[in-house]
């Protein structure tokens, strides 16, 4: 019996919890679908305000991210000769070894190629 009483004294689930209200009953949660949320949206009557459901938003003040033309990763650098964007020195070595005209094909994919007449 000694072992059982010592185990009971260490069991924290048997201790009184003065911080909990024994008479508390949780309110039932009411799940609503998207249609109900949109109907109850008070901003719908005011088109000048932006809300979760409005698709119009002001333009971003952050600069547009630039991506590497070869890998698609974030481009930190730009080659001054070919104007191709690249991610690191390995890609730069690949860009320097491109045959003539291949750089224009990469720029054409990005829609910033130069058409000479």
UniProtKB/Swiss-Prot annotation:
Name recorded for this polypeptide: Chromatin-remodeling complex subunit ies6
Annotated signal sequence range: none
Superkingdom of the organism of origin: Eukaryota
Gene, per the UniProt record: ies6
Native source organism of the sequence: Schizosaccharomyces pombe (strain 972 / ATCC 24843)
InterPro entries given in the database record: INO80C/Ies6, Vps72/YL1_C
Self-association and partners: Component of the chromatin-remodeling INO80 complex.
Described function: Probably involved in transcription regulation via its interaction with the INO80 complex, a chromatin remodeling complex. Also involved in the regulation of telomere length.
Disulphide-bridged cysteine pairs: none
Entry GO CC: chromatin; cytoplasm; Ino80 complex
